Amino acid sequence: MVESLFSGEFLAMAGAAMAALAGIGSAIGVGVAGEAAAGVVSEDPNKFGQVLLLQALPGTQGIYGLLIAFLVMVKVGLLGGDGMIELTMIQGAGIFAASLPVGLVGIFSGVAQGKAAAAGIMLVGKKPSELAKGMLFAAMVETYAVLALLISFLMLNSIQV
């Protein structure tokens, strides 16, 4: 039993789970932005479309994590139909390490982007013509989530299985 917990296959699946943790950041970020959006829409229902756009921005981290988790599962044969391939501890650890950037950065950047989006939503509440500025503030945080996605993708593709 203990041997199966410390196998390459286990580490690879733990890596896929780690990548999927980016969804936590997205869930919190979208929730924070949603709270701000509800306040603005309660004052002016016509601003719903503008604030919904800003509320959706923190959701991308979860998508990035899901993408890397799927790529891990495809790489190890879990989604290919032939069954999971045997992995060495080094291969499993490499896959786990490759999943860390998108998972960890996704958690923190999703929350930070939610706060930036909430501030942008409040800006739109007072000055609807400033939507682009509010989006830019939130998009600045997105840069780091995209960089983490790129790092995870490149690391994952460098591992030979």
Regions found by a protein language model. Name each.
Residues M1-V161:
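Hydrophobic, small-residue-rich transmembrane alpha-helices and their short perimembrane loops
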